[in-house]
Regions:
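Charge-rich, intrinsically disordered N-terminal extensions
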Residues: 1-126
């Protein structure tokens, strides 16, 4: 992973960690109206970190692009074998990837067209 990609990954992970702590606090106070499990809040940070880590996902000679990472992460065979995974958790992963795309767009790494294509790919898993 290049230094720039490592930096982007760290920015995402810091953002996810802050959001997850805030959401977990809301959940514990009983203010969350949704029926989502506490486990989903606790696991999304770890899972998205894993999804963005090319070395832990694929044995490829080249660094996989975002589309390859998304397809691999959400692939039915893989997703069904992730410990504690459930289909209702999927919106957390999608939200996390969307945040990552916003970071990339803000940094000028992707344009609006690429962002739309990535969102379209994510929406195919809903």
């Amino acid at each position: 992973m290049t230094e720039k990609e490592e930096y982007r990954r760290e920015v995402l992970l810091i953002s996810l960690e802050k959001d997850n702590k805030r959401l977990l606090e809301i959940y514990r106070r009983g203010e969350e109206k949704d029926t989502l499990s506490q486990r989903a809040y606790e696991n999304v940070y770890e899972r998205v970190s894993y999804a963005l880590s090319s070395s832990s996902l694929m044995n490829l000679e080249k660094l996989p692009d975002l589309e390859e990472r998304i397809i691999f992460f959400f692939d039915e065979d893989y997703y069904d074998n992730v410990p504690s995974s459930s289909k209702r958790d999927i919106r957390y992963y999608i939200t996390a990837f969307k945040r990552f795309f916003l970071i990339l767009k803000r940094e000028g790494e992707i344009d609006e067209e690429r962002e739309r294509e990535l969102y379209s790919l994510l929406s195919s898993y809903l």
